[in-house]
Amino acid sequence: MARGPGDTDMDEASADAAIPSSTPNPTVAFRCTHALSGHTKAVAAVKFSPDGSLLASGSADRTVALWDAATGARVNTLAGHSCGVSDVAWNPNGRYLATAADDHSLKLWDAETGACLRTLTGHTNYVFCCNFDGAAGHLLASGSFDETLRLWDVRSGRCLREVPAHSDPVTSAAFSYDGSMVVTSSLDGLIRLWDTQTGHCLKTLFDRDSPPVSFAAFTPNAKYVLCNTLDGRAKLWDYAAGRTRRTYAGGHVNTQFCISSGFLGGSSSASFDLGCSMVVTGSEDGSLAAYDISTGHVVGRGAAAAAAAEGGGDEGSAAAAAAGGVAGGHTAAVLSVNVHPSAPLVATGGHHPDNSVRVWAASRTEPAAA
């Protein structure tokens, strides 16, 4: 397998390869507050708006739904793609939304009016992922099954750069917070960092076994990259040092689908105290898992529907109805996870036939006495 420029073999640095998978008692409970129905096929992407007032969900049913994040009311539906929607992204001021779809295109939408403002074409296969730069919001990155990364000027609709990024479908494309770098992941098992201005590859990261990488994103401070791989693991990479810092496993199942992750309890949600910063990821068993970002321990779970019905999962899910929430959970794989920008809330999207969007409230719990 060709590695490309800036290669770094991660086999040399695996000090954290084996870590305990769970604490004796979870310290974070997830209570489902809203179960949002309306999509007729799998929900591939969920994203809170930058101010947290809206939640966008993109589905294989070709539509994007906009929900009031506080009430769960559906406030708009964006329709126009001729195939399923794989990803959604908000620009930094929350006025505009981008969508990536299997019809080989991206669309830009006015989130207030629901009008389609522009269609971006050029990819020659499914467009799987998209993200705005977090600075000015003028750049949009997209990744495709055509194995390329594209950078777009959303003001003109012009493709600024086409990068032959990988040798298999690109599963994620995300900017660093200042927009200077883009990280991509692929089913070819590689994570690559790119210079936004030049399009040059700055670093290629890979494991010895190179499992397919289904998701990658920078941490909020852009010092690390979080990724999900199709061997049931999530990993935190120190890309400058060329090594993994932490591996998260044992709390979620992920061998088939591209599942996203997020950060909870850190700088992006500093208005509450959950006791630790966490990596939150979906699972193919229909649950939601939270890991302590520093130790790798499983610190909480949002129960799948079957587990909740049997009294399993965390106490917050099992007691949701009594606490004013929604009993149960997803009945199929959780494909998408997104964390609210300022509140202890996590949104999730379910695979077919679940097809639902759920919002979970996270709260700290006291471990039971031994």
UniProtKB/Swiss-Prot annotation:
The keyword Repeat applies. Residues 1-22 are annotated as: Disordered. PROSITE patterns: WD_REPEATS_1, WD_REPEATS_2, WD_REPEATS_REGION. It comes from the Eukaryota. Disruption phenotype: Loss of monomethylated, an increase of dimethylated and a decrease of trimethylated 'Lys-4' histone H3, and defects in epigenetic silencing. Keywords: Nucleus, Repeat, WD repeat. It is found in: Nucleus. WD repeats lie at residues 38-77, 80-119, 122-162, 165-204, 208-247, 262-301, 329-370. Its main location: nucleus. Belongs to the WD repeat WDR5/wds family. Part of a complex involved in 'Lys-4' histone H3 methylation. This is Protein Mut11. It comes from Chlamydomonas reinhardtii (Chlamydomonas smithii). The gene is Mut11.
